[in-house]
Design a protein with these regions (language model features):
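Short, well-structured alpha-helical interface segments that form or flank functional binding sites
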Residues: 40, 126, 169
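N-terminal strand-loop-strand
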Residues: 121-156
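Hydrophobic N-terminal alpha-helices or hydrophobic patches in metabolic proteins across all domains
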Residues: 2-122
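Alpha-helix N-cap/loop-to-helix boundary motif
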Residues: 14, 123-125, 162, 166
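Short, glycine/serine-rich, charged loops/turns that create anion-binding
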Residues: 49, 65, 136-138, 150, ...
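The catalytic Nudix box helix
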Residues: 155-172
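Short, catalytically relevant binding-site loops at active-site mouths
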Residues: 27-29, 151-152, 160-161
């Protein structure tokens, strides 16, 4: 099969299943920075060429034992703003949609490496916190509701930022 080149910022693989060949299993030291130890499995998708002209890299979440290869679903794209490549986040199918897939948790898990890069995390799932806000006027309770771009009406909420807890999100 011929190699396929992926453009930087491409999010078309979100939600898709890929096979990853692991070249840095859990516990492996970074080849250029031996003080960095991988707490998760890390590998690449054979045949998919990323912005660095190497095969597309994938962080594997949710499997604590060292692997050689694994089939995962891509749940997030880490776009490095000061680098020429993106990183993907993959999880086993049975973990898709669980809290490990939330943007705030992904950022915490990959911080061991991504702390050195300015980046954004585009995840399929994000943890949100909402609040029921109301006031009373003339003995009647009035609720604050918002109408989003799709026309749905709901309570105000926001996504949990990296390092925040639920209360901090609500206050913000």
């Amino acid at each position: 099969m011929a190699n396929v080149t992926i453009k930087k910022g491409d999010k078309s693989f979100l939600g898709k299943e890929v096979t990853v060949e692991i070249d840095r299993p859990v516990g492996t030291h970074h080849p250029k920075h031996p003080d960095i130890v991988y707490p998760i499995n890390y590998g690449f998708v054979p045949g998919l060429i990323a912005g660095d002209e190497e095969e597309q890299d994938v962080y594997i979440l949710g499997i604590d034992k060292p692997l050689t290869n694994v089939v995962v679903t891509i749940v997030a794209v880490i776009e490095r703003l000061n680098d020429n490549e993106d990183k993907w986040i993959g999880v086993p199918n049975e973990l898709v949609g669980t809290p490990i897939c939330y943007e705030c948790n992904i950022n915490k898990i990959i911080d061991f490496q991504e702390q050195f890069y300015k980046h954004t995390c585009d995840a399929i799932y994000e943890k949100t916190c909402g609040a029921v806000m109301y006031t009373e006027l003339n003995g009647e309770r009035l609720y604050l509701l918002i109408k989003n771009e799709s026309g749905h009406i709901g309570f105000p909420k926001g996504h949990v930022e990296y390092g925040e807890n639920e209360l901090q999100t609500v206050v913000r």
